[in-house]
């Protein structure tokens, strides 16, 4: 739809080591990962950039609102495509997925209990940025659907409990959805990647 609600900027991706068996590289978030050639399509994370509030604050500007998050030419293109019958979809970062990308699954799950102020700041940041980007765009363009990539569950259930959803994730989704639905958005799509029945 012409808006970037997730990471903007970031580190330059660099290859640290490239052998016949694997590639080790650093990505835009500053994570180091290892991909085994011929065996895997998803790299194995070797480290994560966020461990505490100080390390988060170094990356926070990549997630904060900036005017250049909105490409008005793309917004106008989306409007023209919508007139031809195409669905206009906006995406927002996952309320569990972004912390997991920054900290890894284990540290993310512990963060809800051990460093709740860190989790609150991450959530407030992605909420404010997503809201401001999509609020501006939806003044000029009807967004038909909002989609969120979460991957917060496996076949045996979710990686996050109902209390954490209620406290940290639901307010984020609710604020974005209430604003967009008041302007005509009708569809909310979340990729869970597994069984989310325990947190519905």
Give residue spans per PLM region.
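Short, acidic/polar N-cap/turn motifs at the starts of alpha helices
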Residues: 12-13, 22
């Amino acid at each position: 739809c012409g808006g970037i609600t997730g990471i903007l900027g970031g580190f330059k991706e660099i290859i640290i080591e490239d052998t016949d068996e694997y590639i080790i590289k650093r990505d835009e978030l500053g994570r180091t990962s290892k991909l085994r050639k011929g065996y895997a399509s998803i790299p194995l994370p070797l480290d994560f950039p966020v461990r505490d509030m100080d390390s988060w604050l170094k990356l926070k500007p990549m997630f904060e609102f900036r005017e250049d998050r909105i490409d008005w030419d793309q917004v106008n293109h989306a409007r023209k495509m919508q007139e031809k019958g195409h669905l206009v979809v906006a995406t927002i970062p996952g309320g569990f997925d972004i912390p997991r990308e920054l900290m890894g699954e284990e540290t993310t799950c512990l963060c809800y209990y051990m460093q709740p102020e860190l989790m609150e700041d991450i959530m407030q940041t992605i909420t404010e940025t997503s809201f401001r980007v999509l609020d501006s765009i939806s003044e000029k363009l009807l967004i038909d659907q909002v989609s969120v990539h979460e991957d917060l569950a496996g076949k045996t259930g979710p990686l996050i409990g109902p209390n954490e959803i209620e406290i940290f994730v639901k307010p984020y989704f609710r604020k974005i959805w209430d604003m967009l639905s008041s302007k005509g958005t009708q569809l909310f799509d979340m990729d869970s990647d597994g069984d989310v029945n325990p947190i519905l």
